[in-house]
């Protein structure tokens, strides 16, 4: 989705992805995610999924992708980020990813005025975000969700 948005708005993107347990390309193709994509967009999608881990690669002239094969807790970066999409499984499935410590890590990884977005809308998760300094906002949900959450790093 980031690639498609960047392409449409002519943005240059340095996209970093953290995956501890990546979906194999054989499973990704079964999701039929690319059914509405152009042929060129399908090529880019498969190129992203087949890219080597832990190494940046220009997917297109304006889209650099680095996939990090590690746990979020282990991830370190000298760079600060504008946006973090936090798409972990729910707090009931992966409670270790919804703690104050994890939100503190993401807060520290964001630039001032950076944004964290998640499909989760759980009350305790929002309290954890607020506790570490996020300005928390509830938003209308996407992809069939009733509500989602945005955290702003306002310093």
Predicted regions located by residue number:
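S-adenosyl-L-methionine
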Residues: 27-78
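Core SAM-dependent methyltransferase catalytic element
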Residues: 132-155
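A short glycine-rich, Lys/Arg-flanked "PGG" loop and its adjoining helix->strand segment in the class I
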Residues: 96-112
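A short SAM/SAH-binding and catalytic strip from SAM-dependent methyltransferases
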Residues: 82-96
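Conserved beta-strand signature within the Rossmann-like core of class I S-adenosyl-L-methionine
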Residues: 83-86, 112-120
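A short helix->loop->beta-strand "cap" motif at the edges of active sites that frequently abuts
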Residues: 11-13, 109-114
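SAM cofactor-binding core of SAM-dependent methyltransferases
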Residues: 1-46
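Short beta->alpha hinge that forms the Motif I/post-I loop of the SAM-binding pocket
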Residues: 19-20, 98, 121
């Amino acid at each position: 989705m980031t690639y498609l948005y960047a392409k449409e708005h002519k943005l240059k993107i340095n996209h970093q992805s953290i995956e501890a347990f990546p979906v194999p390309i054989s499973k990704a193709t079964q999701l039929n995610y690319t059914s509405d994509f152009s042929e060129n967009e399908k090529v880019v999608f498969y190129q992203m999924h087949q890219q080597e881990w832990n190494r940046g690669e220009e997917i297109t002239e304006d889209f650099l992708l680095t996939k990090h094969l590690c746990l979020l807790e282990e991830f370190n970066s000298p760079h600060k980020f504008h946006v973090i999409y936090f798409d972990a499984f729910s707090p009931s499935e992966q409670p270790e990813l919804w703690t104050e410590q994890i939100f503190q890590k993401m807060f520290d990884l964001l630039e001032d005025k950076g944004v964290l977005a998640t499909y989760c809308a759980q009350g305790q998760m929002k309290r954890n975000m607020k506790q570490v300094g996020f300005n928390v906002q509830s938003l209308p949900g996407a992809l069939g969700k009733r509500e989602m959450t945005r955290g702003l790093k306002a310093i």
